[in-house]
Amino acid sequence: MDEQLEQIEGVVEDIIYENEDNGYVVFEISGGGVLTVVCGIVGELHAGESVICRGRYENHATYGRQFHAQECETDMPKDLEAVYAFLASRSLPYIGARTADKIIDMFGAEALEVIANDPARLTKIPGISPDKADRIQQEFKRMFGMRELIAYLAQFEISPRKAMEVFKAFGVGAMQAIASNPYLLCGEPLQLDFRHADSIAQYYHMEGDCAQRLEAALLRTLRHNAGNGHTCLPRAQLLATASNFIHQPPEKLARALDHCIETEELAVKMFDAVPYIYLPDLLAAEQDIADRLNLLAKRGKNTARDLDKNIQILELTQGFAYAPLQREAIRKAMTENCLVLTGGPGTGKTTTVNAILQLLENQAERVALCAPTGRAAKRLSELTGRKASTIHRLLEVDYTGGVVSFIHNDKNLLKCDVVILDEMSMVDVKLFQALIAALRYTCRIIMVGDADQLPSVGAGNILSEVIRSGCVPTVCLNEIFRQAKRSLIVENAHHIISGEPLQKGSKTDDFFFLETDGEAAQRLVCDLVTTRLPRSYGFDPIRDIQVLCPTKLGPTGTQALNVELQNLLNPPQKGKPQLQSAARVFRVGDKVMQVRNNYEIVWNRIGGEQGVGAYNGDIGIVESINLRERSMVVRMDDRRLLYPAENLNELEIAYAITVHKSQGSEFPAVILPVAQVPPRLCYRNLFYTGVTRARRLCVVAGRRDVVNSMMSNIRQNLRYSGLCALLQAGQPPEQLSTGGEDS
């Protein structure tokens, strides 16, 4: 227990607010003649219960002094008055104040013992049947079973919030399940820290090389690496990594791995005579993608009548001629069943997509435009003048029972003839698998993206793997058009990819480099955001300017810069509400970002439409804060979302974000600090992605040697994936090509 925590105890008098999903409660307790307001994630509480709370007092301007509980122990009501208060609180089914009187009259202070251990005796009360008595007992056991679990897991430093998730996963049998195999906590859907499971295993004197621990380590290693983008790992690397993680010999882990493969907990696939180990769902995803793309590639070509004539008509209408590669892309889009269209900034991808859209619409084809993120979808809509949605919105998320699925799937197909998917480099294998499953057999796919950008945050490297396979028709646009040549952002983006020296630029250009280092770099970035760029260019420092950092750490990492920028742009003021969640402080007016997908959170669109879902990378502004309920309203574009206390950990301050989190977005002005970049993040694709997020202005601030190092390091993040091999395995050798512009 933290020695700094204060302790109070008493009897629950009233429940002011309660969130049943996560156990956040605001309640009043009486003890020592004092009534205290307590709030925190403490699980389910009811009037009449005795509690011991540990935490700290906080003072709020609106709600006064209240106790924020970090730990809460509850005890079954014992004296007659407390037992009656509990029964009369309608916490149990079929029991209200009148029935509570009858139960107390018959059983007195032993009433709860009767409910827990001998519910048949309740049938002596008029109106309580045997079925009702059983229901009362079940609810009582559920209620106090959760309390018991929270207290049990607290000794292993597992929070009440996590304990409630465990209870949801395993129910009243949670403690027995955990005792038999603590490593269940590390698996789906909980994925608790391995050290918690180790602590419980040691409590039960389980050996460090027991089968449950070895197998859990293998699964955890694969899941962890899936979070780093790998869909699979070579067998030898998996064994070595897991061995280092749990300090057990690879030979023992090899036997556990063989058992996991036998029981189909894991899957193995041979690529170039090397065994690769998969989580089964990721192998299924890559195999489904390969099968569908090969099927589309093998299907007969579509007939597009008078295609060249219609392209010429478009050129006359637009007042310009398409470049040869653009014409090639347009032809392939109209005749092939799947196409990859790739190219850097300024090479005419948008112009090409608009031409394809016009020709498809002239043929009365139903086209679905989509992108992986809300910002990317909004940008696609602005560039094409047509409705575009996120992939999640297109498929319609169904989160019934806490499991993500989609309303549109292989049993309920999308009603479209062509899908155009932008920002393809950001799409992970699970999401793309879901999309292709919902497409009709005859539906065509056009994948648009920049293969030189960072790959998806999730597992997979689809765009690069598809291009590398040579199995899918691909056109790579590489000509920079005249209007784009005027932009140093575009010109330098291509210099980065080709490894040529950057043009430094000046204040009259849309790109310039400022040399700086150390703490001076932090001061420069803050000055650019708060003063220089708003004064010189008229940018709003919060809405228009985005700092993109290669890393979270260091003076010019997101963590340090967000503290500085928040205090400069949105400092604390008397009367301005602010809310602390863990190490973060949120204030009205702060720029915030969603950092993980939430498929349940409700939003209201300005204009009346309602929906659900906030996704990793969505950015918004805090509009209001409710201190009593510890909740916030955040506006994201034209949507307002209510974040209750339990969801605040899904938000981060976002004046500065990582380059990885910026994928799929564009900002009027970007500041890219590169004074200190860790070697593992010092590579060309990351620098390129950061620069190409800027629409009107890009300022690179840092050391020239760091810039040169990033530009010269052509290694991309290594990602283990079998998609290229699976695609090629499904194609006859004569159909394979190099994946270049003529493929």
Task: Name what the model sees in each region.
Residues 3, 24-30, 37-38, 46-57, ...:
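Accessory alpha-helical DNA-binding modules that contact the DNA backbone or grooves
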Residues 4-19, 55, 619-623:
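Structural detector for short beta-strands of small beta-barrel domains
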Residues 18-28, 628-633:
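Short aromatic-glycine-enriched beta-strand elements
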Residues 272-418, 467, 471-482, 489-516:
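ASCE P-loop NTPase motor cores of helicases and related translocases
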Residues 366, 415-418, 442-446, 697-698:
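Loop/turn-to-beta-strand initiation segments
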Residues 423, 449:
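Walker B catalytic acidic pair
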Residues 451-612:
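Conserved helicase motor core of P-loop NTPases
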Residues 606, 616-743:
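C-terminal accessory regions
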